[in-house]
UniProtKB/Swiss-Prot annotation:
Protein name: Vimentin
Post-translational modification Phosphotyrosine, affected residues: 53, 61, 117
Gene from which this protein is expressed: VIM
Cellular localization per UniProt: Cytoplasm; Cytoplasm, Cytoskeleton; Nucleus matrix; Cell membrane
Site of covalent link Glycyl lysine isopeptide (Lys-Gly) (interchain with G-Cter in SUMO2): 104, 120, 129, 139, 223, 262, 294, 313, 373, 439, 445
Glycosylation sites per record: 7, 33-34
Amino acid sequence: MSTRSVSSSSYRRMFGGPGTASRPSSSRSYVTTSTRTYSLGSALRPSTSRSLYASSPGGVYATRSSAVRLRSSVPGVRLLQDSVDFSLADAINTEFKNTRTNEKVELQELNDRFANYIDKVRFLEQQNKILLAELEQLKGQGKSRLGDLYEEEMRELRRQVDQLTNDKARVEVERDNLAEDIMRLREKLQEEMLQREEAENTLQSFRQDVDNASLARLDLERKVESLQEEIAFLKKLHEEEIQELQAQIQEQHVQIDVDVSKPDLTAALRDVRQQYESVAAKNLQEAEEWYKSKFADLSEAANRNNDALRQAKQESTEYRRQVQSLTCEVDALKGTNESLERQMREMEENFAVEAANYQDTIGRLQDEIQDMKEEMARHLREYQDLLNVKMALDIEIATYRKLLEGEESRISLPLPNFSSLNLRETNLDSLPLVDTHSKRTLLIKTVETRDGQVINETSQHHDDLE
């Protein structure tokens, strides 16, 4: 049985996602061609020829074409040699030429697009090289500059930390000294307060003695007044007695003049008067001496008590002044202590704020370094992706070159002349059933390239029936 199939193919480019990593040394591409042929025993149905090209995972290209074959819609038709229509062959030849022309135009467009894409890739490679050079330069400069800045910042921070530590130690020593002074002053204040209480107790006892002395003096003054009144009364009584005695003496003197023989009473009265005067003078002298002695004693006791009171007042005033001065000194020391504690807290807060700022600066510098590292890694990944795309494009260009060469060689083959067909009269229904199965041919083509050059190419054919 003779069978003939007419097939045509056209290539279309279908771009997938971005190219992934491929091996820079070599890559393999597979071309699978599936051809279906049908025997003339069945209806002359359309035949489909598919060609699938798979390269690196960066892209998938598939070409499909279909050509209309001779078809018989009536199963019982008999083909006769005299009724062959050669216009159908001319139509097929015309369609075949148009298909080949369209394929050439499509291949030319694909070549132009590939050329533009290659130019773009080269431009991107140049830009990538420039960016890599700038990145290396910035990396070298930035690393040294950041390292110097980091070291300088660290030295400054260490110096400030040491200074703050020394200031803190000095302030703590001053605080301890002030605390000791305050404790000593508090002890001294307690002692002074005890002495003040003792002085007040002594002063209270002295006041009681002074009160007792005042009462005794008042009592003595009353006694002196009573004695003075008694002395005045005695003087008055004595004067009256003297007057009476003088009157009696006058009477006796008169009587003496009359009667000379009477006894002399003047001498007796004189003696009595002298006796009374001596007794009165003695009593008066004794009273005056007793009064003077008592008054001297009371005056001495009063002076002594006044001296003790004045001394107690002076001591109390001195103690009060010392207490006030110590209180002022304690208040001043408290203010100084509070000021030093406030300064210490402010220094600690400033130190904490500066330490936090320096930590933020260090963290920011580390983040910048990490960002630069990530950016450098991203540039490297982009460069690697561009290299992978370049390798994939080199593989695709080599594969298209092979396909174009094969297509040109296939196009250059002479077409069969349908006018020379000599068909016998055959009954289509009498064909065996085995011929109704379709024959499938699987072509596996392996192309290995390196740096855009094809170094190995193999093909395998597998036939199976459907």
